[in-house]
């Protein structure tokens, strides 16, 4: 059974459900910005978010996903203890782990790991309560908890295909001093993992729950490593959009894509880097749209790509589809493929891994694709890559007989 790593928690961050009848896939795949659990009189002076795609060590091997590091500078008008946290729905892993076949993995945590938090340089721990369980009096009195129970509609929630019975509250107590307070936290999470793509969604419109409803000085960094990624355009409440800056080397460009349920095409950033990261900095950040990032794992299986980017880069072509379906090609289809085409088809797995071709024709051909960023001769292929090469080589050998 396929393991589902559900990106729910984004440690010390928050997803408040104001509409439990919302699209369940989107709902359960989002984390978000930490918020005050009671009405806040605190201002966010600065915030820096760093998303880094990487694998980390886990009990069962290496866990793919993204490491998140966030640094806040808050301005508090007075000293005192504050409750800060988030509410998130039950993970789909609970139902998955109820299957006897999967109980041996019941102690695994697929939501997040390597969690660290500090307030003004001192480490703090996170408290967790399931909202179907008994809640301490001080927790039940928090405004966000009362709001959750007031808005929870069991009948509407039960109508969803994947019904979450209730949620969890995660929070920490911060002893703030008057004036500036620094909160730092980091963690690793797995996102929603699939054979075609991994999705990492992040709710940050909840910035509006803080007193100033914005971040005075904001910066976000996305470090994708060698992943091919897409990030839908993000608009801010002032009408401006997030314009990503490439710090490093690689290919980035925009295309237009229609997502499921949308009537119009969205402007989407595509990026494949050799080194470096994407960055956005601004003053008075107040987002209208949420952050969404998709790691594209299988180009030949992706359901939709724009034909070209704004700069003219391509994403895929007929020869790629032929290469990954070589064993299914019919005789009349094979006749249309030249020997030169077969050589290109055979080298697609190498190109996708960033192989730096010495053959100028091959290098020129693959350079038209945004995802082709040569990194060297030593690239790692997997079993399915060798299967593609093997299938094409069979066709080449048959022509020599």
Cite the ranges covered by each PLM segment:
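Bacterial N-terminal signal peptides that target proteins for export
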Residues: 1-8
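Bacterial N-terminal signal peptides
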Residues: 9-17
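Lumenal/extracellular ectodomains and adaptor appendage modules
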Residues: 22-312
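Long, non-globular segments of proteins
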Residues: 244, 315-318, 358
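Short, charge-rich amphipathic alpha-helices with coiled-coil/heptad character
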Residues: 311-325
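A short, flexible low-complexity segment enriched in Lys/Arg and Gly/Pro that occurs
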Residues: 321-337
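Amphipathic alpha-helical packing elements
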Residues: 333-372
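Compact alpha-helical subdomains of small soluble proteins
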Residues: 357, 365-401
């Amino acid at each position: 059974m396929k393991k589902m790593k559900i990106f729910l928690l984004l440690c010390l961050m928050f997803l408040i459900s104001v509409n439990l009848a919302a699209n369940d896939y989107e709902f359960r795949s989002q984390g978000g910005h930490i918020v005050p659990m009671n009405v806040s009189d605190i201002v966010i002076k600065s915030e820096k978010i760093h998303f880094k795609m990487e694998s980390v060590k886990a009990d069962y091997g290496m866990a793919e996903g993204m490491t998140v590091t966030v640094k806040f500078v808050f301005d508090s008008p007075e000293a005192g203890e504050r409750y800060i946290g988030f509410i998130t729905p039950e993970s789909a892993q609970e139902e998955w782990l109820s299957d006897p076949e999967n109980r041996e993995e019941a102690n695994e945590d697929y939501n997040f790991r390597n969690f660290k938090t500090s307030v003004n340089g001192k480490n703090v721990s996170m408290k967790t309560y399931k909202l179907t369980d008994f809640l301490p009096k001080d927790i039940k009195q928090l405004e966000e908890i009362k709001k959750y129970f007031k808005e929870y509609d069991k009948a509407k929630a039960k109508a969803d295909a994947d019904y979450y019975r209730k949620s969890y509250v995660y929070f920490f107590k911060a002893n703030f001093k008057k004036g500036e307070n620094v909160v730092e936290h980091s963690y690793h999470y797995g996102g929603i993992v699939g054979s075609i793509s991994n999705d990492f969604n992040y709710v940050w419109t909840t910035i509006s729950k803080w007193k100033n409803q914005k971040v005075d000085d904001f910066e976000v960094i996305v470090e994708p490593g060698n992943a091919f990624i897409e990030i839908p355009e993000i608009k801010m409440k002032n009408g401006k959009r997030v314009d990503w800056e490439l710090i490093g080397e690689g290919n980035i460009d925009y295309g237009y894509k229609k997502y499921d349920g949308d009537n119009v095409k969205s402007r989407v950033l595509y990026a494949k880097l050799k080194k470096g990261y994407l960055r956005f900095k601004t003053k008075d950040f107040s987002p209208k749209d949420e952050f969404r990032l998709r790691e594209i794992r299988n180009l030949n299986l992706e359901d939709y790509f724009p034909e070209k980017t704004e700069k003219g880069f391509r994403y895929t072509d007929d020869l790629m589809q032929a290469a990954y379906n070589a064993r299914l090609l019919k005789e009349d289809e094979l006749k249309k493929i030249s020997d030169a085409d077969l050589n290109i088809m055979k080298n697609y797995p190498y190109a996708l891994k960033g192989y730096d071709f010495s053959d100028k024709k091959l290098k020129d051909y693959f350079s038209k694709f945004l995802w082709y960023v040569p990194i060297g001769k030593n690239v790692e292929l997997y079993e399915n890559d060798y299967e593609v090469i093997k299938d094409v080589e069979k066709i080449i050998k048959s022509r020599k007989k």
